[in-house]
Design a protein with these regions (language model features):
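Alpha-helical transmembrane segments
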Residues: 41-52, 78-81, 103-110
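Internal catalytic or translocation cores that form aromatic/hydrophobic pockets or channels
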Residues: 175
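Structural signal for the C-terminal ends of transmembrane alpha-helices
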Residues: 94-102, 371
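Soluble catalytic domains of enzymes that build or remodel membrane lipids, polysaccharides, and related
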Residues: 151, 157-171, 180-372
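Membrane-helix interface segments
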Residues: 71, 101-104
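N-terminal targeting leaders characterized by basic, low-complexity, disordered sequences
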Residues: 1-40, 44-47, 51
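N-terminal signal-anchor transmembrane helix
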Residues: 98, 106-172, 189
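Membrane-embedded alpha-helical segments of integral membrane proteins
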Residues: 48-96
Length: 372
């Protein structure tokens, strides 16, 4: 009984002491509205997240437009940078997470996922180039008797590109067929003086305006040469047939209209004219040149249809950005130069090479024309 009383006294004392301590402590003040507001830094990051997410969404929507709507002013230019908007979307997602902008994060996730779906085939080859093709183009000199060839396309920018560098690239890369765009008479003479005919003695050059032209150079004869295979409203697109290990392959040097103010509709028209080549089943084609369009442009994909294939995409090489090369501080961001192969062909060993004097880079590809 005495023990119980003592314990009760101790508990009562502790209770009084706890109550006294509680009274002596200052009561917690509620947060003010200012304290509940996000930090200025977070607000700025949230603003950037929203802006970047909306830009990515806008660019993604433009890429999804049908071909007829992609000829609207400035839409082709926006679409040419589509892969870069995927990167912008990832930045938007990171900023949205940091600033807790849920809607911006969801928009960024959707846009990045869709862009990733569009772009991943560039990094995965379903039809890899056979080892025999790799071996064939590895010799010191080009072997023109097999079904494999190293080909090259390059826009020489109004004939201003360095002719000597072109010849050296042809030599070093063992190029068998070369397509050039925007040539001039003076440039062609410089090319000859630099020794192009030592490696590619056969050529077919044509011009629709008498000033700038397009051309083909080959290590073997160009059979059935024509000035304009496509009947294009943009420029003459010369062609010639090359024998590759018993396979007759028709090469075309392509240059479509650039998507610039005043020429939006003409840009699409020049690509539509190329699309008519799908019905020319009497030849097997390889188109090389400046298409002024990336794979993200619907008119370019319509030209490919179910018959033709972009070499960079089927090779799994990744992006082949080739323009512009003459803007200080600005990287090449658009893959508008292409090698397009016919069904049954495979391609690989894609390479982009900068050559002085042009606003484009050269694109080199190894092709295997054996029917697969």
């Amino acid at each position: 009984m005495a023990r119980a009383t003592s314990a009760n006294k101790r508990n009562a004392y502790r209770g009084k002491r706890t109550a006294a301590a509680a009274k002596s402590r200052p009561s917690a003040k509620p947060y003010t509205k200012e304290q509940l507001k996000p930090h200025k830094k977070h607000r700025f990051l949230g603003f950037l997240a929203c802006v970047f997410a909306l830009l990515t969404l806008f660019a993604t929507a433009a890429r999804a437009l049908p071909a007829d709507l992609q000829e609207l002013p400035y839409v082709p230019i926006l679409i040419s940078a589509t892969p870069w908007f995927m990167l912008l979307g990832l930045i938007a997602l990171l900023l949205a997470i940091v600033s807790r902008k849920i809607l911006a994060a969801l928009i960024a996730i959707a846009a990045v996922a869709l862009n990733g779906y569009w772009q991943y085939p560039f990094f995965y080859s379903t039809t890899p180039l056979p080892q025999a093709a790799h071996n064939a183009v590895a010799y010191n000199e080009a072997n023109t008797s097999d079904a494999f060839a190293r080909v090259m396309t390059f826009n020489v920018y109004k004939g201003q590109a360095d002719a000597q560098s072109i010849v050296e690239t042809v030599r070093d890369q063992r190029v068998e067929v070369l397509a050039l765009q925007e040539t001039t008479d003076g440039f062609v003479k410089k090319l000859k003086d630099a020794g192009i005919e030592r490696y590619l003695p056969y050529s077919n050059i044509s011009s629709s305006d008498g000033v700038y032209g397009n051309g083909l150079w080959s290590a073997t004869p160009l059979a059935q040469p024509v000035d304009d295979e496509v009947n294009s409203s943009a420029s003459f697109m010369p062609a010639g047939t090359v024998d590759m290990g018993g396979n007759s392959i028709r090469f075309v040097s392509v240059h479509t209209t650039a998507p610039v103010p005043g020429y939006w509709r003409q840009w699409k028209r020049s690509l539509d004219e190329l699309g008519l080549m799908q019905s020319h089943t009497d030849n097997r084609y390889i188109f090389m040149g400046d298409f002024n369009a990336t794979y993200d442009h619907a008119p370019f994909r319509e030209f490919l249809g179910t018959r033709f294939y972009d070499a960079a995409r089927i090779s799994g090489h990744g992006f082949t950005f080739s323009w512009p090369t003459n803007r200080p501080g600005l990287p090449m961001f658009a893959g508008i130069d292409h090698v397009v192969v016919d069904q049954g062909m495979t391609a690989g060993q894609c390479k982009v090479v900068k050559i002085a004097g042009s606003d484009h880079a050269a694109l080199l590809v190894t092709v295997d024309v054996m029917q697969s």
